[in-house]
């Protein structure tokens, strides 16, 4: 465990502990050279501990994967320090709170706010899927979305993200958060791909807009208007399509999903009724004009 006040590599001063996991701690640190705050993740190495070795290698792979990424909704990795008994990963310090805490405090979020978040999340997932090879995030959930004081969001924790292998039949390891994870994440149903992230995003949007945690009873994704009749039928259709059991029945890309989200009102029953009314009015006026000739 790092000691408060110590310097790492002669420039990162440890200020305080801000997070703790089973085999790692996260600290707030000040870069003495740049006068800038960073988050520093410390992962301990334990000799002759195979589980720890897997954790360390996974952390290094995660850091190296993220180090090459550059997107406004992703934290940056700026330094990886590999010591004899510990690894330090230096990354953006993200102020704010995860959306699961927002849900616990405030309940269901306003539909328009959720739509805005959905657009941002589609954008960052599409960015990941466009990498070469594509990166499949696999762990979309409110706990991994940080809401910053300025209202922007950041996607965090790439612990189970993986690079898509074109010739693999299925994932080598079954990982995911039950309730949010797609069926194919638990093996025997093919390799996870971009449609897996679309499923997880659909469940996340469901939780955000209804306040109903998919990890709690009734453990099912109901149509969102079952919980709140005032919600959009267009958004309801989008979430239901995202969360189809069969990946072939979901949106096939985040670009396709984003288009649907941007035009969700056009699939709304109220909108369609208004458009039909306008059309009937137009035809009525046109008919009246023809008759008067």
Model-flagged regions — what are they?
Residues 25:
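Conserved N-lobe ATP-binding subsite of Hanks-type protein kinase domains
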Residues 47-68:
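AlphaC helix of the eukaryotic protein kinase fold
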Residues 79-80:
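A short, aromatic-enriched beta-strand patch in the conserved N-lobe beta-sheet
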Residues 84-98, 102:
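Conserved short submotifs of the Hanks-type protein kinase catalytic core
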Residues 117-118:
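Activation segment signature within eukaryotic-like protein kinase domains
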Residues 123-135:
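Protein kinase catalytic-loop region centered on the HRD/HxD motif
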Residues 176-266:
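C-terminal lobe helix-coil module of Hanks-type protein kinase domains
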């Amino acid at each position: 465990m790092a000691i408060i006040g110590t310097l790492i590599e002669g420039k990162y001063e440890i200020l305080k502990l801000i997070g703790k996991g089973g085999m790692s701690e996260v600290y707030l640190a000040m870069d003495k050279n740049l006068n800038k705050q960073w988050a520093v993740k410390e992962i301990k190495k334990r000799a002759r501990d195979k589980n720890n070795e897997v954790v360390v290698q996974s952390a290094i792979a995660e850091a190296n994967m993220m180090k090459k990424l550059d997107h406004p909704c992703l934290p940056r990795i700026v330094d990886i320090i590999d010591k004899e008994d510990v690894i330090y990963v230096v990354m953006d310090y993200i102020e704010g709170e995860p959306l699961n805490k927002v849900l616990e405090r405030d309940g269901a979020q306003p539909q328009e706010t959720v739509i805005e978040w959905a657009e941002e999340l589609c954008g960052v997932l599409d960015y990941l899927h466009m990498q070469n090879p594509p990166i499949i995030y696999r762990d979309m959930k409110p706990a991994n979305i940080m809401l910053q004081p300025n209202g922007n969001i950041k996607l965090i924790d790439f612990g189970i993200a993986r690079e898509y292998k074109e010739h693999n039949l299925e994932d080598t390891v079954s990982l995911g958060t039950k309730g949010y994870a797609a069926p194919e994440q638990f093996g025997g149903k093919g390799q996870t791909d971009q449609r897996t992230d679309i499923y997880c995003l659909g469940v996340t949007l469901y939780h955000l807009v209804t306040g109903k945690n998919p990890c709690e009873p009734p453990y099912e994704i109901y149509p969102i208007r079952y919980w709140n009749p005032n919600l959009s039928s267009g958004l309801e259709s989008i979430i239901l399509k995202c969360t189809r059991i069969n990946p072939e029945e979901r949106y096939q890309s985040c670009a396709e999903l984003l288009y649907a989200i941007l035009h969700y009102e056009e699939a709304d029953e109220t909108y369609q009724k208004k458009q039909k009314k306008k059309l009937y009015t137009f035809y009525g006026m046109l008919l009246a004009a023809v008759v008067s000739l």
